[in-house]
UniProtKB/Swiss-Prot annotation:
Keyword line: ATP synthesis, Cell inner membrane, Cell membrane, CF(0), Hydrogen ion transport, Ion transport, Membrane, Transmembrane, Transmembrane helix, Transport
GO cellular component: plasma membrane; proton-transporting ATP synthase complex
Compartments where found: Cell inner membrane
Cited Pfam families: ATP-synt_B (PF00430)
PANTHER family, alphabetized: ATP SYNTHASE SUBUNIT B (PTHR33445:SF1), ATP SYNTHASE SUBUNIT B', CHLOROPLASTIC (PTHR33445)
Subunit and interaction comment: F-type ATPases have 2 components, F(1) - the catalytic core - and F(0) - the membrane proton channel. F(1) has five subunits: alpha(3), beta(3), gamma(1), delta(1), epsilon(1). F(0) has three main subunits: a(1), b(2) and c(10-14). The alpha and beta chains form an alternating ring which encloses part of the gamma chain. F(1) is attached to F(0) by a central stalk formed by the gamma and epsilon chains, while a peripheral stalk is formed by the delta and b chains.
Membrane-spanning residues: 3-23
Molecular function (Gene Ontology), one example: proton-transporting ATP synthase activity, rotational mechanism
Source organism of the structure: Sinorhizobium medicae (strain WSM419) (Ensifer medicae)
Name used for this protein in its record: ATP synthase subunit b 1
Function noted in UniProt: F(1)F(0) ATP synthase produces ATP from ADP in the presence of a proton or sodium gradient. F-type ATPases consist of two structural domains, F(1) containing the extramembraneous catalytic core and F(0) containing the membrane proton channel, linked together by a central stalk and a peripheral stalk. During catalysis, ATP synthesis in the catalytic domain of F(1) is coupled via a rotary mechanism of the central stalk subunits to proton translocation.
NCBIfam families: PRK09173.1 (NF006611)
InterPro entries the UniProt entry points to: ATP_synth_b/b'su_bac/chlpt (IPR002146), ATP_synthase_B_chain (IPR050059)
Length: 161
């Protein structure tokens, strides 16, 4: 066997492996790798827990948003119903007011017509009385006038009673 550089390299390599085994480097490396694996596993578990928590929060907020939207929709619908009711009530009151005012106006018109007819009749009666008075005064004597006056007075009394 030759003691050349390859032999010394092999002996150095074997001594290096023996030294590493003596110092329990593979155990330390294994422990370090196990610790690192445990840390990564814990971080993954924490990340999973946080993700689930975030998903539950998102679901809760979406549920609350849907509830709020439903409540807003019901409020809008109630407001629309109330507005329609108020509009219908206002329309009904306006129609009633217009009907009352129309009836009152018609009543006033009828009263004015009646007053005008009565005034025309009274004026016609006064004119007829005046004309009759003039005709009778010019053509009748005192006894005939007295008889006509008494007859007319009797007719007026009978119509008034």
């Amino acid at each position: 066997m030759a003691l050349d550089a390859t032999f010394y390299a092999l002996v150095g390599l074997i001594l290096f492996f023996v030294l590493i085994a003596y110092l329990k480097v593979p155990g330390m490396v294994g422990k370090a790798l196990d610790a690192r694996a445990d840390k990564i596993s814990n971080e993954l578990a924490e990340a999973k827990r946080l993700r689930e928590e975030a998903q539950s929060l998102v679901a809760e907020y979406q549920r609350k948003r849907k509830d709020a939207e439903a409540e807003a929709a019901s409020i809008v619908a109630a407001a629309q119903r109330e507005a329609e009711m108020l509009t219908a009530e206002a329309k009904q009151k306006t129609e009633e007011f217009v009907a009352r005012r129309t009836a009152l106006s018609e009543q006033k018109i009828k009263q004015a017509e009646s007053d005008a007819i009565n005034a025309v009749r009274a004026a016609a009666v006064d004119l007829a009385i005046s004309a009759a008075e003039k005709v009778i005064a010019s053509k009748a004597d005192a006894s005939a006038q007295e008889t006509l006056f008494q007859k007319a007075l009797g007719e007026v009394k009978s119509r008034l009673n």
